[in-house]
Amino acid sequence: MQKDPQVASEVKEILNIIKEIAPGGLVELRIPPYAAIQCVAGGNHKRGTPPNTVEMSGQVLIQLIKEPRSWHKLCAQGDIAASGINSDLSQIFVIAATKYPAQ
C-alpha cells in the first residue's frame, strides 16, 4: 500500500491531537499504512493483539475529524472496525475536532 504524503501529514497531526487529549494504553488506534497509537487512560497493552482496537483508513480518519458525529455511521458502514468494550472513541473525536486546525 502506497502512502500519500498529504494524508500521512494529516494522520500524524490528528493522532498527535488524540494522544494529547486521551493519553494512555487502553485502546490501540490503527491507521494503516500510516501509523498506530495507543490511547485512552485505564490500562496498558504490551504484547499481542490488544483487547480494544480501532482501525480505519487515513481518509476515513480525516473525514471523521471533520465530521466527528459520523462515528456510528462510519462504524455501521464498515469504514471503522472497532472491537472491545472500550473501543468507542466517538466522544474523543468530538473533542479532537475542536483542536484540529484545518476546520
What is each stretch, according to the model?
Residues 1-103:
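Feature captures hydrophobic
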